[in-house]
Amino acid sequence: MLQLFIYSPGLGQPTMDPGCLAALIYCALAVPKDEIEILRTANSGMSPTHKLPALWDGHVWIGSLKNILIYLKQKGYNLDNFDAKQLANVMAFTSLLEGSVNDLWLLEAFVNEENFVEAIRPAWSKALKFPHNYLTPNALQRQAKERLAQTLGIRDEEVSYEASRMPISHKWTNATRHRQALLRTQARRIRISSLARQVYGSLESLISDSKFIFGEKPTSLDCLFYAYLSFHAFTNELPQATLRPCLQFNSPKLYAYLKSLRETWFSDDSNILSPLSIKVQPENLLTIARLAWNNVTAKANDTRKSITKFSVPPERKLLWARNGFFIFASAFSFVWFVISNGIVVIETEDDEASFEEVDDAKESIQEKEIDETTESKATHDSSETSSSKELPKEEEKESSSFDLQPLSAQDLLFSGFAEDEIMDEEFGYDDDDDEEFDLDDLDDLEEEIV
């Protein structure tokens, strides 16, 4: 069984959203009553587009009115049988209804602050449960302002100051502010009326004398006509209504067509919704948490969009570019000065390899020198040891060659002189200056020895 999820009723309509109303009317006319169930909800989190209407076929979710109509036609629930010319008209007027006609309603209902505060927000809050009654109206107003900023170029600051939002103490006493608010409101009404007359005139050209647009049977285009234009024609709660009088006086044929559809589909005698199973989707903590999370993510996306849309004056961009160029040039010149003067040396892998080879060569040379010194020292030590061994042998030979004989005192004495002469000859020692040896002393010495 198919399940269609739509917003709750309000503002004199079965549902307070034009897209939901179009899907509801089409399903009531095309789908058998035992094959579809209508669920009223404020939770749009189940929809792939996060907007209602949404359709669940038991396996997959379908979001947005356009996708729902295409899916139902593919399943065989088709109200249309157009030829080529009719199909071209349907596509053109469908685009007009979903575009300009819907923009006019959003402009009057959600952007006009007095209408929103006094009529639209209370109606939504009354139809929805907590916490949807606080979150959904403001979310719809935010979406409407974003859409109109793209389609009609209306900025938020153009409609943010209204007479209804003035403090009571200033509303009537401050004549200047009150006059400015009234002028803005009047200018917006003129703009809405001008755009509405053009749109209504184009739509009225398609209305014929037949009961429906293309004959005696309703089509998807009839559903769209009534869904989008009924809010213009039959909403009585707005304190500043501009679209309804404009439609009544400037396009009476179109207004009569809408009244005829209302009597055919929603009169007390023949209501196409009465056979349908319409229920209210139960709310639980999970759906409330999902809604809260969706609102948090929506605000985060809005903040991200506002940051990305931040515009910088051209003069400031030029200043930033100039400063950036000077900073880059200064940094480049400093780096070039440091590298060119050798203050910082950038080593590559080849340089590191060459340095390693040089270090290895130095180490090998040092090792060779150490080996040579150790070898020379070893040879020197060995030679000294051999010489030291030979010297005692020679001394022994010399000592053995001389026989010790007893010497007299005179021999000992003169032997000393002989040694002195030898020392004088070898070392050039001259003792001529010494005192002459006294012979008397020599005789005394001999006597003492004897």
Curated annotation (Swiss-Prot):
Pfam families: GST_C_6, Tom37
Domain of life: Eukaryota
Region Disordered, residue ranges: 355-407, 423-450
SUPFAM superfamilies in the record: GST C-terminal domain-like (SSF47616)
Principal localisation: cytoplasm
BP GO terms, sorted: mitochondrion organization; protein insertion into mitochondrial outer membrane
GO CC list: cytoplasm; nucleus; SAM complex
Compositionally skewed regions (Basic and acidic residues) per UniProt: 374-383, 390-400
Keywords: Cytoplasm, Membrane, Mitochondrion, Mitochondrion outer membrane, Nucleus, Protein transport, Transport
InterPro entries recorded: Glutathione-S-Trfase_C_sf (IPR036282), Metaxin_GST (IPR033468), Mito_Protein_Transport_Metaxin (IPR050931), Sam37/metaxin_N (IPR019564)
Localization: Cytoplasm; Nucleus; Mitochondrion outer membrane
Family to which this protein belongs: Belongs to the metaxin family.
Entries under PANTHER family matching the protein: FAILED AXON CONNECTIONS-RELATED, METAXIN RELATED
Function summary: May be involved in transport of proteins into the mitochondrion.
Protein name, UniProt field: Metaxin-like protein C409.19c
